[in-house]
Amino acid sequence: MSDNHTEHSLSLTLTPTISEQPVLPSTYLDSDINCPILKQRLDAFQRWQAEAFNSGTSAEVLIAARSDYIDHLLQRLWTFYGFDNVPETALVAVGGYGRGELHPLSDIDVLVLSKQRLNDEHAQRVGQLITLLWDLKLEVGHSVRTLEECLLEGLADLTIATNMIESRLICGDVALFLQMQKHIFSDSFWPSPQFFHAKVVEQQERHKRYHGTSYNLEPDIKSSPGGLRDIHTLLWVARRHFGATSLSEMVDFGFLTNAERNELNESQSFLWRIRFALHLVLTRYDNRLLFDRQLSVAQLLRYEGEGNEPVEHMMKDFYRMTRRVSELNNMLLQLFDEAILALEANEKPRPLDEEFQLRGDLIDLRDENLFVRQPEAIMRMFYLMVRNQDIKGIYSTTVRRLRHARRHLKAPLCHIPEARKLFMAILRHPGAVSRALLPMHRHSVLWAYMPQWGSIVGQMQFDLFHAYTVDEHTIRVLLKIESFADEDTRPRHPLCVELYPRLPQPELLLLAALFHDIAKGRGGDHSILGAHDAVEFAEQHGLNSRESQLVAWLVRCHLLMSVTAQRRDIQDPAVIQQFSAEVQSETRLRYLVSLTVADICATNENLWNSWKQSLLRELYFATEKQLRRGMQNSPDLRERVRHHRLQALALLRMDNIDEEALHRIWSRCRADYFLRHSPNQLAWHARHLLEHDSTKPLVLVSRQATRGGTEIFIWSPDRPSLFAAVVGELDRRNLSVHDAQIFTNRDGMAMDTFIVLEPDGSPLAQDRHPIISHALQQAINRSDYQHPPRVRRLSPKLRHFSVPTEANFLPTHNERRTYLELIALDQPGLLARVGKIFADLGLSLHSARITTIGERVEDLFVLADKDRRALSLETRRELAQRLADTLNPNDKL
């Protein structure tokens, strides 16, 4: 299988111009042992390492060379400070340094070991030695312990014990070091079974910190699942149990096969190379591939391409490599537990059928060559897993046979008729995703089944919107869809839980989810390309024309509902009619809303909030009503205005309001005001307006969430800069505006409504209501408002993204409105700047829908000129140019 190899090989070309390696510190004279000279020579060594790396020298060679250099430096300093004359003391390398692995910024962990506690003079000399190393800017971690203290502290602390297990003598008393080794490898010091289980728990806890996946878009090369720590865990376990000090020795002890050893060596080499490059880019120790470092690292590793392509190619290789490490790590730890430790007598396997048996709760092959002889048996195993809830996983030796068979397939599994029948049977079974598709993905069987899947494995997008790679995102979409069958999901997704049981064929939704992003990374429109793939796959798997076309439509239109709800004016009947015409039926609408919600939730866990939920619900029910009414029948807007007014009046009469005064207020309002507000909102506004001093602006902050956010209502004399003043103040208060409805009455009073959220997507905190209200009052009263208020600086993370500003004017038959879709880099004060431009050009804003997608904003503004007409072509051009000039600053704020 192709998952054996990375797609974009690194350049390893050696050049003959590399300078000679600096001399080792063991040759230094006593007169050289001072900070300036040592720092100068250490800097020269580090320059040589960078030069050698850039010239193609392998990371393995350079890592070992650095460890060797530090060995010689410490040996020379040990002698210089007279410790060669101190009996029963030793200097010991521990941790990664103990393994002989030092990257440019790695910690240098050492143990000063002694038989008896050091006297004051010797302790002072140790302090001088360590201080000198710190003055050289080396990251040195040290401990000074007696042999007895080492053993006691090692027994009490797993990390200390692990460091000691991979200790290595640098210089000093050999017998003392061997005595320590004898103790730490004895049965009384962390017995192998106890050590193993402690390291497994430690790994599980570490993985949880990274959400159980190496596919985070800013991974930690060392600690993320599938990273170097997972290889270290295997080494630690084998070191403690067998005394093995390398991957090759693990083969000798039967813990690894030759193929597995080679695969781990290749993986370690790749991860070392990326980590070495990262350390050359940084000035302080860190192992995280953050966005602002990825391009520099990719270029250092000679990845090529336009724009973000070098990063995407490098990260694809990284994710594919960590997948392999994760699979090997899980399999080998399981194998160690089941076959080598054998803590309990092996439970007698229970036959499941002629081919498979159950060992505990793990499925196991009865014939180890079955998968090679009959590749379709792989699918039979996963079909058994989805049908039998007693099966919780795959036995380690069967995973080993599966990996072997997978690499020797002559054609994709979907070319086998029986495999296709089994695949569809899996999809139609409850629990298909969690019990079959997820493990199929983890063991690269989805890739072996459908070649298209391989192209998205590890495929990232260099942005702040997509939290996972395309394959990981797709699996999360599938899992989210499956959760809609669970009543426990109802509180978070009530609409989807209500609709999911009404889908006639849920397997078609799973197929659409499987293909919705399958064409990403190919170039072109991934929705259209993916729909083409989906039709071919559906027909190959025996679906009829209606079923195939539904799957293809869902793939082609999987973004339609999200875009319409978040970036279009869904209170405009024309928008609802256009959307309904595409959807065509209530059945397709139910499929589409389920896919849309799952897609949003699986893109980024922070995206889903009550605001988005309210938008999708509103669009769903408006479309359902339109489909039931019939496409030829548009809503009666006059009747809706009358209905809203009557309902609001009924609410207000309960408060014994002055109806004559109310009608004076309402008579100044235009029809749009009544159309776009609910009766409850109309009554809320009216109650306060009737009691308010009409010579002052009114600011209301709703105590109850409106469409998932907090509603802020402003009544004030209108002026061109009002919108900019309000949104500028809201931005200064760290509130995000998601929706704005702007109305100007016949008497020139503005009646504006804003929906705002806190940074975490929640409604405005109650204790902030009076503060925000007062701040807005002051902002509105500033008659000299000319420029947006001083805004926060662009965040460091955003500085590394480039989003060219686009001003797209959407087609419409409305002669009184222009619909502007603005795409730009998200930046503090953006709305205030945009509002200032509108004011400068004399444009009136009627509504705004604000959508932030990672580092991008994709906003919709409904505009008119001073004569309440759509913008002329000349005005559009000027507006587009002003927006580009303002939102594409060269210094990025």
UniProtKB/Swiss-Prot annotation:
Its cofactor is Mg(2+). Residues 711-793, 819-893 form the ACT domain. Keywords: Hydrolase, Magnesium, Multifunctional enzyme, Nucleotidyltransferase, Repeat, Transferase. Residues 470-592 form the HD domain. Disulfide bonds: none annotated. Its EC number is 2.7.7.59, 3.1.4.-. Residues 352-710 are annotated as: Uridylyl-removing. SUPFAM superfamilies: ACT-like (SSF55021), HD-domain/PDEase-like (SSF109604), Nucleotidyltransferase (SSF81301), Nucleotidyltransferase substrate binding subunit/domain (SSF81593), Poly A polymerase C-terminal region-like (SSF81891). Residues 1-351 are annotated as: Uridylyltransferase. Has four distinct domains: an N-terminal nucleotidyltransferase (NT) domain responsible for UTase activity, a central HD domain that encodes UR activity, and two C-terminal ACT domains that seem to have a role in glutamine sensing. This is Bifunctional uridylyltransferase/uridylyl-removing enzyme. It comes from Yersinia pseudotuberculosis serotype I (strain IP32953). The gene is glnD.
